[in-house]
Amino acid sequence: GQSVLVTGAGGSIGSELCRQILALRPTTLLLLDHSEFNLYSILSELEQRIARESLPVRLLPILGSDRNPEKLLDVMKTWRVDTVYHAAAYKHVPMVEHNIAEGVLNNVIGTLNTAQAALQAGVANFVLISTDKAVRPTNVMGSTKRLAELTLQALSHEVAPVLFGDMGNVSRVNKTRFTMVRFGNVLGSS
């Protein structure tokens, strides 16, 4: 029984991850999303399934963003998260082209915030949901996802990582395994 956190839990990829993870019966499934409506929708669906199938899983909806590192760390420590699936991202190519700064903040800085919180909380596994557009990127969205991947690769190679915002001598041992998956175009994703 693991404690699992899914960021972007209300999105098309995040919500499907939640459905699949539920079948594996984690002790706790934490759903984090910045959209109240999307979070409510996936929560309601999963609660119905838990009741119907008598699953021994605790669901926790967390309204929040990967741009809030303090909240991420608090959630991961409080619920002793074992695995993070980081699906929160802006993924619409034209939208990110027109909103470059927001794309960078969400896809790159949000990933950095989530990864650093995982390191600080001693999370065992961190899985980044990436995209095939990160391979030799030709657009801003693909570039932001590639930067997110490179960020995790850099953190994974550090035995004793120094995190952004660390003050003084902070001794930390990297206990987090970082992995990433690249999806192609996903049928039915918004």
Please describe what each predicted stretch is.
Residues 22-24, 54-57, 94-98, 174-180:
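Gly-rich Lys/Arg/Thr-decorated short loops/hinges at beta-loop-alpha junctions or inter-strand turns
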Residues 67, 134, 186-188:
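Conserved sequence/active-site signature of Rossmann-fold short-chain dehydrogenase/reductase
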Residues 86, 90-150, 154-168, 178:
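Conserved Rossmann-fold NAD(P)-dependent oxidoreductase catalytic core, especially the SDR/UDP-sugar
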Residues 110, 188-190:
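Substrate-positioning beta->alpha
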